[in-house]
A protein has these predicted regions:
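Feature captures the catalytic ectodomains and active-site-proximal regions of enzymes
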Residues: 1-513
């Protein structure tokens, strides 16, 4: 029996936008896609925000998109996951966080919360700190101190004072907590082994050395008056009655509420590593130290509140378990996406998984060669479809995204037209072997190349919907509206007449006519 391949085709960065201006997808000549949308089941799918496990309204990206697709479930990114746990109440049952509270109560010691105080959502979120304060109140911890690292990169450069004032209002409302120190992220969150900076922040936290102040908002204002905005605020110790409010000492608990690891590692090592080499520590308090996420396996003496979610039974694993063959095809720029990210962050290929890599062209920017390597990628796809070797083929065309990032409209139009031709060749090959295909995108990009408010070039991703098209499948099916990327693989599994595994919580898009 010959194999009838099922193809998942991802047009990277190919969104749908009602506006025509600066819309390369609309301005390009796309006879193939136009025909497919007219003749086959076609709906708009969601590829941004909560639909892909990101905060509401946040644009999607390729890593998140491919991970959601391959997992067949919404994969919550750390920010959303922690926020969701606070809302659901699971946060308040977290074992590592409860252990930090318990340690302080048993030793009549303090709990210190440190981290980036902003709503930037890149490294941390201030609502997560508010959740910790609420937890401390519920658990009856009395000595609670906050060490504020000020942002000014993922938020406006002089917004820190407002965040400090909002924190003070929140602590008053909850009924627990005092601000002990404020430091710019330049010092507390270095990631380039500039230990002299980290040392200043660490000393403020552990010895009470640094600039002195009696009121946190006033201390931040004084820094502004000195032409040092949030990021560069010198480590400042807030004093009460001439003494530091809350120095981190033996038997205390420390919770570092940043969830992104890269800028959290260095100061964490200063607290946790026995063989720390960064600088001579004036104080080495022995504390219960809890990191929000696992910043690094090699950091010693730490606990982790939110472990990385291991994804079991991704599409690749599922196919391998059913002794089915699969091909992953992409050019260099998107090769990791159809392999590592599609497999849930796992590098090793599955049994029966062939990986076909086409090199991306060596040009300074892709507007200089908007075709990129799409013709060669298409050739490999057609060969794979006709090879009688594969049950499933996952293919990515990088052009609309990579050329869209240049913001050059003519080039982006050419990129979209190139991909349209490739889709046409794939459909022809597919019909010859009576295969079926699902066409989608991982997020938008090429459909918006200008900022509609300012008229300036727009080179980022978008929150626009993406096309979902079902090609040459059983004609009794159409597609439902309001689907998301996590629903695609459950759709393919149903098309192949197989049983959806329990781990996949996405829902098939198929509807019988």
């Amino acid at each position: 029996m010959s194999k009838k391949p099922t193809v998942l085709m991802i047009l990277d960065g190919y969104g749908l936008n009602d506006k025509k201006e600066g819309n390369a997808v609309y301005l390009a000549k796309t006879p193939v896609m136009d025909k497919l949308m007219a003749e086959y089941p076609f709906v708009k799918g969601n590829a941004s925000g909560l639909a892909v496990g990101l905060p509401d309204g946040q644009m999607g990206n390729s890593e998140v998109g491919h991970m959601n697709m391959g997992a067949g479930r919404i994969v919550y990114q750390e920010l959303t996951r922690i926020t969701k746990e606070i809302q659901d109440g699971d946060f308040f049952k977290n074992e590592a966080l409860l252990a930090a509270m318990k340690n302080a109560k048993e030793n009549n010691s303090a709990v210190h919360f440190m981290g980036l105080l902003s709503d930037g959502g890149v490294h941390s979120h201030n609502t997560h700190l508010y959740g910790l304060l609420e937890m401390a109140k519920r658990e009856g911890v009395e000595k609670v101190y906050v060490h504020c690292f000020l942002d000014g990169r993922d938020t406006p450069p002089a917004s820190g004072k407002e965040f400090v004032e909002a924190l003070e209002a929140e602590m008053k409302k909850i009924g627990v907590g005092e601000i002990a120190t404020v430091s710019g992220r330049y010092y507390a969150m270095d990631r380039d082994n500039r230990w002299d900076r980290v040392e200043l922040a660490y000393n403020a936290l552990t010895t009470g050395e640094g600039v002195k102040g009696t009121d946190a908002p006033a201390a931040v204002q004084a820094s502004y008056d000195n032409d040092k905005t949030d990021e560069f605020v010198l480590p400042t110790v807030i004093e009460k009655d001439g003494q530091p409010t809350g120095v981190i000492s033996d038997k205390d608990s420390v919770v570092f509420f940043n969830f992104r690891p890269d800028r959290a590692r260095e100061i964490t090592r200063a607290f946790c590593d026995d063989d720390f080499q960064g600088f001579e520590r004036k104080a080495r308090p022995h504390v219960t130290f809890v990191c929000f996420t696992d910043y690094d396996d090699t950091i010693q003496n730490k606990q982790v509140a939110f472990h990385k979610v291991q994804l079991h039974n991704t599409f690749g694993e599922y196919l391998a378990a059913h002794n089915m063959t699969q091909a992953r095809i992409a050019e260099t720029e998107k090769y990791a996406h159809v392999t590592f990210f599609f497999n849930g962050g796992v590098e090793e290929p599955n049994k029966g998984e062939d990986r076909i890599l086409v090199k991306s062209p060596k040009v300074a920017t892709y507007d200089l060669q908007p075709e990129m390597s799409a013709p060669q990628v298409c050739g490999k796809l057609v060969d794979a479809i006709k090879s009688d070797k594969y049950d499933v083929i996952v293919i990515n065309f990088a052009n609309p995204d990579m050329v869209g990032h240049t913001g050059v409209q003519e080039a982006a139009i050419k990129a979209v037209e190139t991909v349209d031709e490739c889709v046409g060749k794939a459909v022809e090959a597919l019909k010859e072997v009576d295969g079926q295909m699902f066409i989608c995108a991982d997020h938008g990009n090429a459909e918006q190349l200008i900022d509609y408010e300012t008229g300036a070039p727009w080179t980022a991703h978008t929150t626009n919907p993406v096309p979902f098209i079902l090609v040459n499948a059983d004609p009794k099916y159409t597609l439902r509206e309001n689907g998301c990327l996590a629903d695609i693989v459950p759709t393919l599994i149903q098309l192949m007449g197989m049983e959806q595994p329990a781990e996949m919580t996405g829902k098939s898009l198929l509807v019988e006519k």
